[in-house]
Each structure stands twice: as C-alpha cells, then as structure tokens.
C-alpha cells in the first residue's frame, strides 16, 4: 500500500538523520555539510585537517580522521556511534590528486597514496558505518567521483581512482541494497573551489572553459551540495547504483565543441 504523500525534498527533509561527510574542511565538502545541515541533519564533519565551521551545540561534530588509516576510521565511527547511535548518510568526498603527468612519469609511491585516500578511504568509511546502517535497516552512501572517470585527463591516477570508485559504488548498491542501504555516486565537472582557483586566474583560460560548458558558467560547490542533498533524501529513495553527473552539460557537449566554429 502506498504511504501518505509527504514532500520529500524540503527544508526539514533530513530532520533527525545523521550524516558523515569526509573531506569536509573546505570547498565541495564544506558545501555538502552546509546543505545537509540546512535540511535538518546532524552532520559529522570529517577531515584530516581541522574543520572551520560548526560545533556540537548546533548539531555538527568535527572529527579529525585520516580516511586511509583503518584505525583512524574506526575511531571516527566509534565517535559517531557514541554521540548519535546511528548513521543515515555517508558522503565519501575526501580525495587527493597530483600534478598533471603521464603514468610513465608518476612515482609509484604517489600512485599508491592517491589510491589509499580516494578508493581505500571510501571503502574503509563505508565498512565502518555499515553496521549502523544495517542495524537501522537503511542508509544512503554517496561517493564523490568525477567526470575524469569517463573523460581521461593527464591526472591519470586521480581519474583511475574515480572510475574504480564508481565500480565500488555499484557493488555496494547490489550487495547492500537488500538491507535498505542505497549507494550512488556523483561526478562533478569543473567546480570553482579554493583548490581549483589557480586554473581560473587566467582570463583567457577561464573564458575558454566557460564557452565549452552549455550552462555557460563554472560550477559552484553549492551545485554539488544540492545534488548530494537530493541523493541523501527520500526524494531519491528508488535511486540506487547510479552516477549523477553535475557538470553543466560539459561531457555531453564534447562533439559539439569539436565542430564549433
């Protein structure tokens, strides 16, 4: 029988829920935290560095954690369990990259580090909160991937980890879906953040990039925050194992840009 209609995507859509967000100290991660908190969720802001905003008094808990270290992740999960006793939303956003070089020149140590944080970290965090989601018979895992998973750049190790993260997402969706746990990924396009700002300081490069995007603008962290909020809410309750591309139409316009005059 259908349940009574309730608007699933409102300002209090996440009231009473607990969200864990990694890579929360700035940029996209911080915007995700702001969106989830604004919709009523208690937010655990996880980063290897100190998070600049929020306190336990306003429903936000800051936790220092190295997502590539299993002991550090388990300690983070213990804090979530002790403070809230549940976890409804996990956003695996923590990631690192490297300077654009070909794989033939990329040191193996750097390759391994990128994989440890971007891929191993997502798995460790998901495994750590899984018992809470399993016991409460539900949860939403959102892995932040990238359009570089489908459109290779010279950030070879980064794009490879993001493609693998999408595969991991689908595996989680299939294995954990029967337990009420959804898993989806988000692939941001060009987003202007403090870390990416150097790419946009050259006016010529900036205008060229804007012209390649049908939306005719560079994305903002809030664009990703809104997409995560959708996947975290009941508005997406039947969405599982999918990748949501948030790029203003950039990837779809590749052939159009090729033949543009």
Identify the function of each model-found stretch:
Residues 2-10, 97-100, 240-261:
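Short C-terminal tail/terminal secondary-structure segment
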Residues 39-55:
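Conserved glycine-rich Rossmann-like NAD(P)H-binding loop of the short-chain dehydrogenase/reductase
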Residues 131, 174-178, 237:
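Alpha-helical segment proximal to the catalytic Tyr-Lys
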Residues 146:
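Residue(s) in the substrate-gating loop at a strand-loop-helix junction
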Residues 123, 217-246, 251:
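C-terminal substrate-recognition "lid" of short-chain dehydrogenase/reductases
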Residues 101-103, 107-115, 141, 209:
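Substrate-binding pocket helix/loop in short-chain dehydrogenase/reductase
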Residues 126, 161, 169:
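Active-site helix of classical SDR
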């Amino acid at each position: 029988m259908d349940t009574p209609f309730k608007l699933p995507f409102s300002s209090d859509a996440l009231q009473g829920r607990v969200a864990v967000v990694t890579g929360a100290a700035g940029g996209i991660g911080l915007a995700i935290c702001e969106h989830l908190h604004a919709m009523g969720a208690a937010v655990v802001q996880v980063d290897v560095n100190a998070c600049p905003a929020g306190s336990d008094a306003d429903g936000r808990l800051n936790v220092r954690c190295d997502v590539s270290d299993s002991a550090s992740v388990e300690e983070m999960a213990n804090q979530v369990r002790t403070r809230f006793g549940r976890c409804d939303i996990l956003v695996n956003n923590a990631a690192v990259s490297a300077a654009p070089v070909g794989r033939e020149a990329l040191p193996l140590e750097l390759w391994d580090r990128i994989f440890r944080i971007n891929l191993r970290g997502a798995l460790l965090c998901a495994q750590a909160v899984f018992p809470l989601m399993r016991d409460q018979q539900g949860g939403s895992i959102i892995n932040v991937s990238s359009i570089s998973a489908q459109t290779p750049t010279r950030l070879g190790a980064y794009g490879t980890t993001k493609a693998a993260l999408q595969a991991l997402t689908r595996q989680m969706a299939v294995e954990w879906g029967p337990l009420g746990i959804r898993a989806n990924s988000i692939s941001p396009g060009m987003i202007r953040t403090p870390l990416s700002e150097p790419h946009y300081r050259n006016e010529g490069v900036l205008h060229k990039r804007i012209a390649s995007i049908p939306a005719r603008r560079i994305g903002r962290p809030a664009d990703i925050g809104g997409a995560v909020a959708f996947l975290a809410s009941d508005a997406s309750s039947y969405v599982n194992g999918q990748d949501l591309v948030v790029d203003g139409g950039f990837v779809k316009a590749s052939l159009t840009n090729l033949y543009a005059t």
